Amino acid sequence: MFKYDKKLPYPIDIKNKDLKMAKYIITQFGGANGEIAAALRYYSQKFSMPTEEGKALLNDIATEELGHSEMIAAMVSQLMNGASVKELEDAGLCSQYTEHGYGIYPNDSNGVPFTASYIASMGDPIANLVEDMAAEQKARAVYEHLIDLADDEDVIQPLLFLRQREIVHFNRFKELYEKYLSQGY
């Protein structure tokens, strides 16, 4: 069912270390409004969609969100590249380093680990799609905040791409939501 393409949906080539941005951006990997939560939410919900069209849409977007999580992980890894333990300490990343070294771990910018409580799957297509539209808007807002915090075009451009994908996903969910309402679901 899944096919892995060995390239990112958008190229990541960050040349400058920026540990504060790494700390902020990790939230889109393992935070409540991040890409892993979105992928699991949509993948779980697809099984209760009443039409093949709905199942396919949620599966397609879930798969895309996994690609976005890989982009975020690549960004964090590149932003941390070459950092000393002292630099990690100065950036407030010591607890991250203590538990995970230079590895990428699904948590938010405060170090709170990912939890399945971030996702919702009601078994009701209308409730799920409203949840999905809200999730995409929250992710869009987080990307806008990250863009505001960034000053490196190598960071800003992938964030702009990810922000735009949230808007596309919102619109796709809205189209399906409106279709289901018109069909009496």
Give the label of every model feature segment.
Residues 1-185:
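Non-heme di-metal
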